Amino acid sequence: SHFFEYLINTSRIYWRKEMEYAFDGNLNAMSKYHAQHPFDIEGVSLTPEEIKEQKANLINKIFTFGYMMHHFKSPERAWAPMAMDNKIGEENECNGRSGKSFFFKVLSILMKTVKLSGRNPKLMDNPHVFDQVNQHTQLLLLDDCDRYLNTGLFYDNITSDMTVNPKNNQSFTIPFEDSPKLAFTTNYVPSDFDPSSEARLIYMVFSDYYHQKTEDNDYLETRTIR
């Protein structure tokens, strides 16, 4: 499927070695190879270790997609995906446009979703932050999270009941088994890799196979999902 092809390419973290560096600037050879290997997780010039890493990256995405789609929830296996870019720029910031949001856009078509902007690091200071959530919500997506957003404040909502405090209405609690699964996307390297975070988050890494060429980078072209 086209979606599986997308998953493969967002897992090709060594695509530049495979598709550019191996041809020493020969654009015709690059183009020919790309046409022959548009969705190849086992690049010809990659080492066994690099191929293994790319396959693990792909399996991680497949597992995460299946986990999010499954409506059964277990307190012992309650996780939230944290999607980030593999390529890190200055000040631990990524350029984005790697396809992270598309992963959850597909999920949002299949799941009843509430999306909140994670750009506000004080998001959880709002007592009505979950105002849009109800017992029918299946996915709560915190998109484009700020580097200073404390994801630890959401951990109780990942592993237990969720309390919703709507504006001008009475608060209510959604039992864990009926509460939405959470997910995060960010353009920054998470600052917390403590045991508590690792027990609750599924880290997802997206390659820069899909990218935008600008004056500030050395990409040869712009490559998009479409």
Question: What is each PLM-predicted segment?
Answer:
Residues 155-162, 183, 201-208:
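Signature of the SF2 helicase/ATPase Hel1-core->accessory helical subdomain module
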Residues 176-179, 194-226:
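Phosphate-sensing "switch" segment of ASCE/P-loop ATPases
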Residues 139-143, 177-187, 204:
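Structural recognition of the conserved hydrophobic beta-strand(s) that form the central parallel beta-sheet
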Residues 88, 146-147, 187-191, 207-212:
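Conserved nucleotide-binding/hydrolysis micro-motifs of P-loop NTPases
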